[in-house]
Amino acid sequence: MRTAFCLFLTLLAPLAQAQMVAPDVLVKGITDEVAATIVKDSDIQGGDTKKAADLIEAKIVPHFNFTRMARIAMARNWRSATPEQQKALASEFKTLLVRTYSTALVNYKGQRIDYKPLRAKPEDEEVTVKSEVKPSGSTQPVSIDYELEKTPNGWKIYDVKVDGISLVTTYRETFATEVRERGIDGLIKSLAAKNREPLGSKAGKS
């Protein structure tokens, strides 16, 4: 499935080391590592989204800036949130993305990923790593761009665009509606409730 595969790829580009390695090198390196793990893991290939989520938590989550991602998704409503609410929003947003993309990760079957040359200056604080993917059964490549920021702990991903569409800002309208109707606490409760729902997969298989 093209959409599921693209969603999976959005979480395949974290930093392998805290040292300041070139962002495109890091993206390719960790993508290759995670992709190889998936292909060899019969449980994930068989649809075990719990195991897929564990892989995401271990290999990918530490290298995303979920606070900035939540801030982008919340837009102007972020400024109205207290520090405690902001922390809760970032946490629930992280869990939501992990759960969402773990169901997509099991669809990866070794599709080819090509990377574009990085166009950035040494002093740049933010860069875009561009790639193209050729999903199985499709002749049309899918562009996937990773937006990264330089931090004291290395490069962190704060957004991903699939065919030019941000997978973070796609939540903006839904979040705005929730805040308008139920307030920020209502949005947090709504996200928490969704995150408590069963994954609806072969999770838990041992």
What are these regions (language model features)?
Residues 99-141, 194-206:
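Surface-exposed, charged secondary-structure patches
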Residues 141-169:
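Short beta-strand edge/turn micro-motifs at domain boundaries
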Residues 1-4:
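Positively charged n-region of N-terminal signal peptides that target proteins for export
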Residues 159-206:
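Low-complexity, intrinsically disordered terminal/linker segments enriched in charged
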Residues 14-19:
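Sec/Tat signal peptide C-region and signal peptidase I cleavage site
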Residues 20-101:
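Early exported N-terminus immediately downstream of N-terminal targeting peptides
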